């Protein structure tokens, strides 16, 4: 049975998908989300869309009832990251991330900055980008396997007060064993069918595989946003998630 984060979702209503809104502008984004139900998914805004639209779009989506993952991958001095997390909390952001390689002091400052909020955003550490393989790590001076580096950074994130990490589905099972059932695992690189995949997410799995491995949330972009019926895709993944939970 897949571990559940019971503080955030009940087994009967598990909705693990975070839809990556990888659109270039506000018009296309709002046109797409108009047909989504906040009860079926969470949504994510990344660097491109946030840079193009600023906080106004993010706040609009939050006001529509969506749980928003602000995926800006903070990596800066502790004070700067802490202040950014406070701004995100003031906006009502549900989840925000930062590079765990920014170190303990940066992550502890972020956790302390939002500790006083009644409803604080989940703080998530970015470990190893899913586009990176062992050869990529070697090029930046890390002579270790991706899984080893992920576990090292995830342990650091947990001990620094973060709520979870971003990891590929391949790392989910060992992380779940190492860090326990309450640590949030956010998994990108999710595809409905891995056969013939040639995009930039190297370490990929299907929703069922990722959930079985221990992932808490599944980041899905094109498989949802380019689907003929995005709602049908979300309902099917939710169905699989609740079967896995039971």
UniProtKB/Swiss-Prot annotation:
UniProtKB keywords: Decarboxylase, Lyase, Pyrimidine biosynthesis
Binding site for substrate: 22, 44, 71-80, 130, 191, 201, 221-222
SUPFAM superfamilies: Ribulose-phoshate binding barrel (SSF51366)
GO molecular-function terms, A-Z: orotidine-5'-phosphate decarboxylase activity
EC number(s) given by UniProt: 4.1.1.23
Reactions accelerated catalytically: orotidine 5'-phosphate + H(+) = UMP + CO2
GO CC field: cytosol
Pathway annotation: Pyrimidine metabolism; UMP biosynthesis via de novo pathway; UMP from orotate: step 2/2
Subunit note: Homodimer.
Similarity annotation: Belongs to the OMP decarboxylase family. Type 1 subfamily.
Protein name per its UniProtKB record: Orotidine 5'-phosphate decarboxylase
Gene giving rise to this polypeptide: pyrF
């Amino acid at each position: 049975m897949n571990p559940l984060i019971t503080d955030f979702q009940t087994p009967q209503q598990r909705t693990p998908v975070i839809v990556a809104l990888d659109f270039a502008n506000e018009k296309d984004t709002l046109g797409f989300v108009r047909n989504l139900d906040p009860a079926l998914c969470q949504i994510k805004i990344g660097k491109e869309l946030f840079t193009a639209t600023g906080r106004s779009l993010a706040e609009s989506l939050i006001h529509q009832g969506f749980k928003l993952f602000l995926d800006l991958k903070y990596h800066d001095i502790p004070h700067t990251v802490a202040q950014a997390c406070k701004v995100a909390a003031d906006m009502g952001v549900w989840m925000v991330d930062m590079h765990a390689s920014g170190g303990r002091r940066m992550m502890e400052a972020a956790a302390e900055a939002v500790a006083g909020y009644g409803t604080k955003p989940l703080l998530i550490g970015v470990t190893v980008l899913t586009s990176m393989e062992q050869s990529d790590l070697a090029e930046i001076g890390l002579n270790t396997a991706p899984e080893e580096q992920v576990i090292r950074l995830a342990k650091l994130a947990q001990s620094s007060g973060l709520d979870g990490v971003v990891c590929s589905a391949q790392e989910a099972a060992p992380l779940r064993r190492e860090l326990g059932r309450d640590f949030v695992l956010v998994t990108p690189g999710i595809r409905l069918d891995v056969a013939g995949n040639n995009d930039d997410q190297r370490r990929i799995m299907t929703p069922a595989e990722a959930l079985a491995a221990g992932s808490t949330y599944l980041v899905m972009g094109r498989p949802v946003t380019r689907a003929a019926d995005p709602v049908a895709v979300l309902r099917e993944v939710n169905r699989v998630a609740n079967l896995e939970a039971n």
